[in-house]
């Protein structure tokens, strides 16, 4: 991978960024730094830590059998260049993953801020949202991935780090580590109003048990806490004041260590077979990607809405987002696909969160929702693991 310089923000841009978007967490204990190679995967040895109205049904691309287990890990608010630059000493595991597994080099978030990216990845549209306000949940009363999985008899769970209990609708925990805006499943009324469905949204600690007992569902979504996903802002992971602030480096390390731990646990579990894959991506790029720096910030197709700033909402009480201007897509972020025995592959095709959804749906033979059904402008990620 060619060396890339870490993009530096202007003082003005950083001040806006630091007020809203970064964080850090204490280093994890118990992580063994020695990495082993399992197939193509560079992983550590770690201790166990409604109705269907969509496009026609899809089939997996030809080649290998469908994936038995699909894992999605959604990280936060960090750009492709910042993560994969060889000048960043704090994301070494992420760089190893990218160098030894599937890498989509032109993968983009859908928009800013966080929540509509999560909604896009699980329903195929943002439904007009560009806000993190959880009180807008009724807006998302639409068909979603959970509806599809259950209609097809595909087992699923969403594992949320620091979620107090299964299905808990708390907006944020007192320590600030769990935030509902990073949990799309409890933003859909037909999930959070259904006790059985909401019970499948569980604390991340449950995944250790499920991996150890071999009771891992076919579809797994993992959301780290607000420090470990590189977002930050909790008391234990304050916002950095500048790009060179040690708090910024700590955020990188926290996310890198989180992935080192959980990729290791997954790939050393009974669920890790030749028909399993882990999709690792970031919801959106850094704050600098919200400005029209050039074509690298904007991808073609339905993944690139240009939205006006959102004012404060007097109806819901939600604060305004992106008060400084417009949004040019969600920014350039990595998409790393870890699949056993596949090796390093690179796909330069433009892709984004609708591509992730399309890939999941095609794997399980589900209809294609919303923009995931735009087969002209949205391509799947199968070249990275088949």
Each model region followed by its residue ranges:
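Terminal low-complexity, poorly structured segments
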Residues: 18-21, 34, 365
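N-terminal secretory signal peptides that target proteins for export/translocation
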Residues: 1-23
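Bacterial N-terminal signal peptides
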Residues: 28-41
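N-terminal pro-sequences and low-complexity stem/linker regions of secreted or lumenal proteins
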Residues: 49-386
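Generic hydrophobic-segment detector
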Residues: 25, 29-30, 45, 114, ...
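Cleavable N-terminal signal peptides
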Residues: 35-36, 46-49
